[in-house]
């Protein structure tokens, strides 16, 4: 479980405090504040050129973990197989089992820089395969999938008519190239549940806020589970997240730079040892 070593930026905290002072302590709509969903849609457009209908294709969840859980529960029938690259986040396997699915593990290899290859994916697909979980950028390996890697995966996904759950919670923490979402490829938005949140990019782990973007037919089923199990994500957190989305780009960039400096500091002795 990733925990940023930064505090939530003050202007984001202030917005949460202000919402309490203004008495905004009631339920929001089940799917989340309209203002927040609008900002999420704008963020995805400016960052990745992806267009989502805030009213029909975006919902706010209690962290990305809830989004993973309800996506699996909404999509799986008993015995459906879910391909899960490992190592990765601890929740994928138990959530699959709880939803009645069967986890199928693909061990990522160091020689492939811990990226999933089309050959590895193809090798584990069966007639029961329904979903591919894409945990990239990856925790704990730090692996990313570049555009060419994703193109090969997309081809296999389409050939076998699979759905994808793309956990992109670390999308802001790449240090060389920008993150590429698998949902941005032609024909993939219609078969992808994109999951993201505020914990890593904005150092908001304790605020417990994430979101899911999906085709309307899938999102409707996810929302049914969410509204009866959760009602809505925390109201105070949602107002703070609006501020994060509107004015948090500089904070994200500063934290990314600090993480990158730490990466350089840790990796430099290893590089020097390899040279010597």
Q: Regions from the language model: what does each represent?
A:
Residues 264-276:
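Single conserved hydrophobic/aromatic residue that forms the stacking wall/gate
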Residues 185, 189-260:
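Conserved core segment of the aminotransferase class I/II
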Residues 104, 109-178:
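Active-site phosphate-binding strand-loop segment of PLP-dependent enzymes
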Residues 97-104:
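A short helix-loop-beta submotif of the ANL/AMP-binding
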